């Protein structure tokens, strides 16, 4: 009789419970993004936290806080929307390159954390106003600013020395609106 867990016939929690520390994480059923907090607490010592941090869509800020020494902070910084308060609280743990690329940050937050922001990624992925860009002209990546931010012709003229000469300002495909 085969006592191997059958991923097609059981929930992720059942599969992990039955497999224990021998769980094949590649075979965990698709409902894995619904592991309960109680389940994660009970099995915290055998869960693959890289896998949980990447796959678990209902991993809330409170759950991340509870399991802060177990989660993979690169995945946490990438795969879920984090509040600025949460990022501030865990500023020593988050991956700032990923935060600058994947989180939505206010200009005020970027100003307060200017030494942590990855300006190359922020210049491409964060919405920045002309006043903000002007204030941080020595930090921003002008190639990305000229490609991905909406800039007025007056601003372009004023900051012409910073703007790469070969830039055609393809703002019609700007990912930031």
Regions flagged by a language model, labelled:
Residues 2-177:
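Alpha-helical scaffold segments
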